[in-house]
Amino acid sequence: LELETAGMLKQTKGQLGRRQQVKPEDQLYKAVSPGGWQLYWGKNSRTNDYVSRNMTGPQDLWFHAKGMPGSHLVLKCGDSADKVSEEDLHYAAAFAAGYSKGKDDGKVEVIVAQGRDVKKPKGARPGLVTVDSYYTVMVAPRRLED
């Protein structure tokens, strides 16, 4: 190994071009709503898949910009969804809008669903889900300050 790093031996095939695999949970955006609820959303289709399949519980609230590509966002509330204020709902929806194709629009329609209504079809590509039951809210897009 020392000879390989010194350049005296040729690298083995398994070591050539090997990149460190980035875990989806390391690529999430995170925020806290005004009411103290944790928000998580994906940066790409792989992390969207992780958010929708691994982080969203049956009672959590799930958000996505309607009719356009965008991040899947979860508001972690467990069985306390009825305690989430309108302000917190709109705050989360604004991030879902801000991390979608509609980020530069004045207002974006955002889907709000319970986690149990979000399903991944068998064999579907990463980031693709179906939503059985939802309602929508209109919000102005918001992004984290970079």
Task: Name every feature range the model reports, one short phrase each.
Residues 1-38:
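Coiled-coil termination/hinge junctions
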Residues 29-41, 47-146:
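Phosphate-backbone binding interfaces of nucleic-acid-interacting proteins
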